[in-house]
Amino acid sequence: MIACYALGLSQAFLYVRGEMALAQERIALALDEAYEAGYIGKNILDTKFSVDVVMHWGAGAYIVGEETALIESLEGKRGMPRLKPPYFPAAIGLYGKPTIVNNVETLSNLPWILNNGASAYKKFGSESSPGTRMFAISGHVKRPGVYEVEHGVTTFRELFYDDNFCRGIRDDN
């Protein structure tokens, strides 16, 4: 909602990949609760700002991580990248209108940045790559999970073997 408010948008779409059934259930419940509490919908928190959120269940193709493929899927087409030019959905996006596409990782940074400031956020990471990055690691590691690390500071070796993260390969193989 922060991004919608900042940009003056009245409609947002949440695209959830088809194979993520549990995420779909949880997001649908969260949306219902947010509408009921007045955090989304008409006149949010008794203001003149209104935004509706549409959740779209995708077919489950990895390629829809590419922003124009995601837009194609939202439009009910096969989720394949669009021919370019135009290169950016900000020029011609969903239903031919200017469109902003952000992922969960990007949007999850907004509350922290708003509360603490962009200069404080830039203190994380390296000078050439400020900020943090989230890694979802599964498979044959001792502690699978989602880990937030600083750009340019944490190595993949640390991510996989450090006690603060994955703690190494399962069965030490």
Regions found by a protein language model. Name each.
Residues 4, 160-161:
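Residue-level preference for well-ordered alpha-helical positions
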